[in-house]
Amino acid sequence: LSPKECNYWLKNVEAGNLYINRPITGAIVKRQPFGGWKKSSFGPTVKAGSSFYPSVFKRYDEVKDYDMLVNDLQELWSIKSKKIKNDNLQSEHNYSVLYPHKKVLIVHDENPNPEFKKYLDSIKKIFGLTVDEIEFSKLEDNDSIDKYSLVRWLSREPAPEWIYKYNFSLDTNHIVQNSRIEIFSWVREQSISITNHRYGNIGFSPVSIEIR
């Protein structure tokens, strides 16, 4: 395999699970958490088998202190924005990394409160992403909406059926006080597995991985 091609593929492909130098996929708890992006995902896109996964089965209070939530998100992002090695294997490189969504659309009702506006400004700074807003009454079915990788549905109205035909993930969760849940409304997790052996001989990976 060409190291140049592998590195280019790693940097440019948009998928939830990436595999290099191996003939099959994998889905192993913690080592290779599994879950797709785009149409192969729904909700906040938390991967099955990841350290975040048990959190999705709990109920959380809606946000009451935006400042506290912003501080918690900043602290969590400072840790989870780095490549995190999922095991100590020498024969495989298994790691996970969180990537901010490039563009997020917020669908809400009229006149969101000032605290929410302040929160969105903080989110843009923390994750360096583009966040657009639109009122539910002005939302239209056209291809321009497909430029977003995630739509955050905060309107009291139900999402229309046509919205599911597009490539983005649809997140209908309310803003909650828990940062480990809330972060997945702004980022998505990628799991990467690279075989580092050839017929049992260690060190035959086509890609050099730096864990920061």
Regions found by a protein language model. Give the residues of each.
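Conserved C-terminal structural/oligomerization subdomain of aldehyde/semialdehyde dehydrogenase
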Residues: 1-212
